[in-house]
From Swiss-Prot:
Pfam annotation, one family: Terpene_synth_C
InterPro entries noted in UniProt: Isoprenoid_synthase_dom_sf, Terpene_cyclase-like_1_C, Terpene_cyclase_plant_C1, Terpene_synth_N, Terpene_synth_N_sf, Terpene_synthase-like, Terpene_synthase_metal-bd, Terpenoid_cyclase/PrenylTrfase
Metabolic or biological pathway, per its Swiss-Prot or TrEMBL entry: Terpene metabolism; oleoresin biosynthesis
Name the record gives this protein: 1,8-cineole synthase, chloroplastic
Organism of derivation: Picea engelmannii x Picea glauca (Hybrid white spruce)
Length: 612
């Protein structure tokens, strides 16, 4: 929301308070990368400054003093890798054939668990795209033995097994099979509680880990899944304190840290490579591991090329000259390449990174730098969608407008290649709704109005920018998205509303204090407190966390419901974008200050290959 005229604000506004935010420390990167990186260590405080960049008369503006770009363009352009050599691709292709044979060579003993473990391993290693047919055959086989009590380790098992059943419940549900969580009722004792022994054996711990993972794909009103999550969480927290550091303890910590909704497939693959030998001791895990490492590094070479393109786009667009905005294009690209590692989807990854960067630039213009008069002109120009509309814009806005205009049109061209039709009208409608939502927030500050929670939340679902970050990137994919399917994904569909709502709520819990420090009073927290006199910040946060928890279950249902009219593949990338953006808010606002977690994510999933 923008700082505008000096109209008096509501009593709950913070513009009359200190505009200095808390100091954020930028810690050094790991030594392997540090010598070639340079960034300006900044204290991202909020202050008032005078600028004469747009007119003869000085204009008073707020600037958030965001730290500069961490990833120097010269460094990005200097990246090189040996993994583009054909020999690596040839070796990977041979291994793909050998792994396919592994799918076909499973014996009758423990055949259900073996198939599930094989599917899980290729998915967690990030190589599942090579084995779609094998995965479907394996899961069809497992599902054919599924019953109201779950499954055992093998087709001839007399008794159902918690480990196999929990793993199957999660895996089958994620692949769209109609499986009920009621099977978990059969693993409770006579008192209706999940039972376990006093001695935590490795087998039991693995069973409870799979129960925990299954509980994260719960649908609304699945009480047994809620009970499973509570029980398994308590059990695993105790177990990890007692068992020695091992592949099992690391897997527990990783899964409890990232769960499912903030887990990134490429990050998981990087972590799982070190442990999967121990996880699949009864199979030829060496071939899987070698293939996973080769695929990781071959994709790493593609990441370097894409990152160089993105960095040139950022530099050529003139964004590097805008010192009042956040520069997070590398971080956004990292998130995109952590959820989609298909070499054919370069346009998706680059499009997502560009759209997110444009959102961030506009967020900083509307939040801090732009005046109300400028914002009205810019909003009108976006709606006209014509370069001549920039005539009355200040110089800095002219450049931004043209980059938005050219990038959106370029993305529409990419979408036409894959969808076979012009999609620019979808994009224009999304941008108009997005920019209108920003103007509404600016007007709230200008008038001193603090909206109701519901009014803020509904507008905030649009102003978050999820629709912009998703729409054009997914249209570049080789997944048919005709109008009737697209309407189920984009705003105001139920799917889009849930995703946008989750991210708006989660984002506000991470940003509201910094936003309030620079005079942006309206947030889910402040609006809830205003609607409920006497409510504390803790009350508001508890309410919002409960909302997010329930919305997550509804979101799971919208993606995975068995009678889905829209294929999971059509919604999967939009769902994964939600996971990626959610990941950035896991610890704090990773988009305003690039914290150590975000920096390490860039290093481990983009900049550094894995040792072969």
């Amino acid at each position: 929301m923008a700082l505008v005229s000096g109209a008096p604000l509501a009593s709950r506004s913070c513009l009359n308070k200190s505009l200095i935010s808390s100091t954020h420390e930028l810690k050094p990167l790991r030594r392997t990368i540090l010598p070639t990186l340079r960034w300006k260590s900044a204290t991202p405080s909020i202050n008032m400054c005078l600028t004469t960049s747009n007119s003869v008369d000085a204009v008073q503006r707020r600037i958030a003093n965001h730290h500069s770009n961490l990833w120097d363009d010269d460094f990005i352009q200097s990246l090189s890798t040996p993994y583009e050599a054909p020999s690596y691709r040839e070796r990977a292709e041979r291994l793909i054939g050998e792994v396919k044979e592994m799918f076909e060579s499973m014996g009758p003993n423990n055949d259900l668990l073996q198939r599930l473990s094989m599917v899980e391993s290729v998915e967690r290693l990030g190589i599942d795209r090579h084995f779609k047919n094998e995965i479907k055959s394996a899961l069809d086989y497992v599902y054919s033995h599924w019953n109201e009590k779950g499954i055992g380790c093998g087709r001839d098992s007399v008794v159902s097994d918690l480990n196999s059943t929990a793993l199957a419940l999660r895996t089958l549900r994620l692949h769209g099979y109609p499986v009920s969580s009621d099977v978990l009722e059969h693993f409770k004792d006579q008192k209706g509680r999940f039972a376990c022994s006093s001695i935590k054996t490795e087998g039991e711990i693995r069973s409870l880990l799979n129960l925990f993972r299954a509980s994260l794909v719960a649908f609304p009103n699945e009480k047994v899944m809620e009970e499973a999550e509570i029980f398994s969480t308590t059990y695993l927290k105790e177990a990890v304190q007692k068992i020695p550091v091992s592949s099992l303890s690391r897997q527990i910590e990783y899964n409890m840290e990232y769960g499912w909704h903030t887990n990134l497939p490429r990050l998981e693959a990087r972590n799982y490579m070190g442990d999967m030998i121990h996880e699949m001791s009864y199979m030829n895990a060496e071939k899987l591991l070698e293939l996973a490492k080769l695929e990781f590094n071959i994709f790493h070479s593609l990441q370097e090329r894409e990152l160089k393109h993105l960095s040139r786009w950022w530099k050529d667009s003139g964004f590097s000259q805008l010192n009042f905005v956040r520069h997070r294009h590398v971080e956004y690209y990292t998130l995109a390449s952590c959820i989609d590692i298909d070499p054919k989807h370069s346009a998706f990854r680059l499009g997502f990174a560009k759209m997110c960067h444009l959102i961030t630039v506009l967020d900083d213009i509307y939040d801090t730098f732009g005046t109300m008069d400028e914002l009205k002109l810019f909003t009108a120009a976006i709606k006209r969608w014509d370069p001549s509309a920039t005539e009355w814009l200040p110089e800095y806005m002219k450049g931004v407008y043209m980059v938005v205009y050219e990038t959106v049109n370029e993305m529409a061209g990419e979408a036409k290649k894959s969808q076979g039709r012009d999609t620019i009208n979808y994009a224009r409608q999304a941008w108009e709704a997005y920019i209108d939502s920003y103007m509404k927030e600016a007007e709230w500050i200008s008038s001193g109005c603090l909206p109701t929670f519901e009014e803020y939340y509904e507008n905030g679902k649009v102003s978050f920018g999820y629709q912009i970050s998703v729409l054009q990137p997914i249209l570049t994919l080789d997944v048919p998205l005709p109008h009737h399917i697209l309407q189920e994904i984009i705003f105001p569909s139920r799917f889009n509303g849930l995703a946008s709502g989750i991210l708006r709520l989660k984002g506000d819990t991470r940003c509201y204090q910094a936003d309030r420090a620079r005079g942006e009073e309206a947030s889910c927290i402040s609006c809830y407190m205003n609607d409920n006199p006497g409510a504390t910040e803790e009350d508001a946060l508890n309410h919002i966390h409960a909302m997010v928890n329930e919305l997550m279950k509804e979101f799971n249902w919208e993606l995975l419901k068995p009678d889905n009219n829209v294929p999971v593949s059509s919604k999967k990338h939009a769902f994964d974008i939600t996971r990626a953006v959610h990941h950035g808010y896991k610890y704090r606002d990773g988009y305003s200050v690039a914290n150590n977690e975000i920096k390490n994510l860039v290093i481990t999933t983009v900049l550094e290959p894995v040792p072969l």
